[in-house]
Each structure stands twice: as structure tokens, then as C-alpha cells.
From Swiss-Prot:
The species this protein was found in: Marinomonas sp. (strain MWYL1)
Annotated InterPro entries: bL21-like, bL21-like_sf, Ribosomal_bL21, Ribosomal_bL21_CS
Protein name: Large ribosomal subunit protein bL21
GO cellular component: cytoplasm; ribonucleoprotein complex; ribosome
Pfam families: Ribosomal_L21p
Record's keyword annotation contains rRNA-binding: yes
Domain of life per record: Bacteria
PROSITE patterns referenced in this protein's UniProt entry, alphabetically: RIBOSOMAL_L21
Family: Belongs to the bacterial ribosomal protein bL21 family.
Keyword Ribosomal protein assigned: yes
Residues making up the signal peptide according to the UniProt record: none
Length: 102
């Protein structure tokens, strides 16, 4: 059984017991979270596709950890000006473990 959920502007294909990193959520570690934006639920041959979401479908998860991703390096270079600007960015994420698909 798997489902497709939407969180943080992205879509994820999830199964029970799976761990994944999503955009930062305001839930403390060890807390439970419920995803209501379920776009698709598949249980064997029974496939339910939402328009835009599946009515009554919910995916529950447990927050494992919060953290920051790898650094993305940015370089702005101005030709012939002897000028450049180096910057970096590390995006916050929340690691969740899927506990149930209903």
C-alpha cells in the first residue's frame, strides 16, 4: 500500500515505515503529524485518485529529527569588473517516519 502526499509545495510517494525528509515543519521531535493532502491511495489493485485530494484519506507520521541539508554554493561573477560574490545556503528540513495510511 502506498500514497502520494503533498507537503511543502512538493509531492512525495510514501509507504508505511518509510523515512523521508520534507520541508521544515513546526512540530517538535517525537511528535505526531497528520497529512491531509493525500492525492492518491493505492492498495493492491484498488487505486483512488483525488480531484484534487482523496476524501477521508489521511497519512500519519512521527517526527524523527530536524536538521539542515547540504550547502548549496552560489557565485555571482561580474565580468571585467574584478568583482565576485560568494554565498551559501543550507535549507532546513524535517525527517519524518510514516506510521500509517488510512
Amino acid at each position: 500500500m502506498f500514497a502520494v502526499i503533498k507537503t511543502g509545495g512538493k509531492q512525495y510517494r510514501v509507504e508505511e515505515g518509510q523515512t523521508l525528509k520534507v520541508e521544515k515543519l513546526a512540530v517538535e521531535e517525537g511528535g505526531a503529524i497528520q497529512f491531509d493532502d493525500v492525492l492518491l491511495v493505492c492498495n493492491g489493485d484498488d487505486v483512488k485518485v483525488g480531484a484534487p485530494v482523496v476524501e477521508g484519506a489521511k497519512v500519519t507520521a512521527e517526527v524523527v529529527a530536524h536538521g539542515r541539508g547540504d550547502k548549496v554554493k552560489i557565485l555571482k561573477f561580474r565580468r571585467r569588473k574584478h568583482s565576485m560574490k560568494r554565498m551559501g545556503h543550507r535549507q532546513w528540513f524535517t525527517e519524518v517516519k510514516i506510521t500509517g495510511i488510512n
